[in-house]
Amino acid sequence: MQFWYSRTWITWLMLPLSFLFWLISTCRQFLFRKGIFASYRAPVPVIVVGNLSVGGNGKTPVVIWLVKQLQQKGLKVGVISRGYGSQSSVYPLLVTPDTDPIQGGDEPVLIAKRTQVPVCISANRQHAIELLLQHQPDCDLIISDDGLQHYRLQRDFEIVVLDVQRGFGNGFLLPAGPLRELPSRLNTVDLIICHGQASKYSDVEMTLVPHHAINLVTGESRLLSDFHRVSAIAGIGHPQRFFSMLENLSMQLIQTKAFQDHQTFEAAQFVDFDQTQPLLMTEKDAVKCLSFAQKNWWYVPVEAEIKGEKVRSFLAKFDEIRKTV
């Protein structure tokens, strides 16, 4: 929504609805906190990775990074997710690297591929956790991909990911603005990760680093410096970020196309692209294109680099968990 990032007449028209949204969400949070509304406590610690605003903020790379950090500590980790974009007829659903993204959702399938840990999806987070623990009874920790505002699920740790480039938009709550909660919510979380340069709100800065491109058909890996004139597509929360990354790598983008986040792809959507030039896409998009990929299609995986004393302090909390399992 373009008007979320400015203050137009549409913004002011919707402001009363934003006040109603704030009133309802604040009351719900209070009722959960006081125990008037029932909430679920998982038998193992839960880490929620979420954000304050609608749209892509870089949560998935953070989840993948966090899984790997905890695995290095010897912990067995599982992931749960709402599974946005999933069209499964059965929930909860155990997502594996081989699950069809139409059924499992693009982000859960990507997480399963990159981490090899069990991923369960359901709008009911309790049901997702119960299925996950049936599959992996010795799980030490569960990471919830998104769900910061899902107060029905009790949590032990909270991480918020902020996109510096878009910030808080016009600063208003839904539907006048992009915010699900007010920025004051940041005062209660355990770690704030800024996607992009640091801001006054962030504890640490995250950089998404691309190293190479992988061919969707052959699996060949190639240096990004080998690519010069390319086409590119992106079906993520902020497509321009991907296009800018490629341009910063000295690539000339001869054709680009931005799709909606969690877009379901079909071969017909790609017929207008020049088949003689490489077509680059995100890894999240690639998992949905494997069944009809062409030999000139490549995806660019990224690794989250998150450093700093506050990260070390946060991760040190899980050393004690390891000692008790």
Swiss-Prot record:
ATP binds at S53, V54, G55, G56, N57, G58, K59, T60. GO terms for cellular component: plasma membrane. Pathway: Glycolipid biosynthesis; lipid IV(A) biosynthesis; lipid IV(A) from (3R)-3-hydroxytetradecanoyl-[acyl-carrier-protein] and UDP-N-acetyl-alpha-D-glucosamine: step 6/6. It comes from Pasteurella multocida (strain Pm70). Transfers the gamma-phosphate of ATP to the 4'-position of a tetraacyldisaccharide 1-phosphate intermediate (termed DS-1-P) to form tetraacyldisaccharide 1,4'-bis-phosphate (lipid IVA). It is an enzyme of class 2 (transferase). One of its GO terms (biological process) is lipopolysaccharide core region biosynthetic process. Signal peptide: none annotated. Keywords: ATP-binding, Kinase, Lipid A biosynthesis, Lipid biosynthesis, Lipid metabolism, Nucleotide-binding, Transferase. It holds the Pfam family LpxK. Belongs to the LpxK family. This is Tetraacyldisaccharide 4'-kinase. It catalyses: a lipid A disaccharide + ATP = a lipid IVA + ADP + H(+).
